[in-house]
Amino acid sequence: NCLQYGDHGTTFGGNPVVCAGANVVLEKVDDGLLEAVRAKEALIRETFAHTPEVMKIDGMGLMLGIQLQQKQAATVVDECLAEGLIVLTAKDKIRLLPPLTISETELKTGLEILLNVLNQPNKE
């Protein structure tokens, strides 16, 4: 009863304590982190570049939205969750928002699950 739908999706929600935390994070960000994020974004985009179900990918860095051809985003979310992967929706898109520090191995594992779900025949 503590968390409401969507509550877990905000890293820095705007109150003074989290804003102070955000300032510390900004002090720690360096070019190496940004280069790693760009490489991870490229990996995500390349993974889905030839996936028929993916119409387009919007966003930047690791905050991405995947527009689907036919599948319903909510159905994909449920199927991913059943496989152990948490993804969100943003209207009719699949919303990806992994931590900036996600390892390449973890990212590839999650992308493989999502790719398998997207390549399954439509159950609807």
Regions found by a protein language model. Give the residues of each.
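Conserved N-terminal phosphate-binding loop of PLP-dependent enzymes in the Aspartate aminotransferase
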Residues: N1-E124
